[in-house]
């Protein structure tokens, strides 16, 4: 039962944390019925798919999985912040500056202590306020 409710999601997140995107993608592709995962693990499944897609420059897939992950409303602020940052960055690259600013405002409303993410937010804030 645990396998169906949790799948390889913890291992996927560990692979992503270590920068092993290819291994994370292989593990994600092994999940045949993501709807059988618990709601929290479904949220992290889509979170991981969004990160893999962003890494591969697949903007549409990254946006789709980011929205799916956020819809569960079960991720921690740090993960939500990462998704908002990725969405803001993509919107900026697509010259959709108002949308980028909206994602940045949502990101700034979170309580995230991650220094790396804070630096990225400052950089994005700087280019958007020009």
Model-found features: residue ranges?
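TPR-repeat structural position
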Residues: 8, 21-22, 59, 97
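Terminal, low-structured helical/coil segments at or just beyond the last alpha-helical repeat
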Residues: 100-130
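Transmembrane alpha-helices and immediately adjacent membrane-cytoplasm interface residues
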Residues: 1-17
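Amphipathic alpha-helical segments of tetratricopeptide repeats
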Residues: 28-33, 66-73, 105-110
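Short coil/turn linker motifs that delimit alpha-helical repeat modules in TPR/alpha-solenoid proteins
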Residues: 37-41, 74-78, 114-116
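"A position-specific structural signal for the A-helix of alpha-solenoid helical repeats
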Residues: 10, 14, 41-51, 79-89, ...
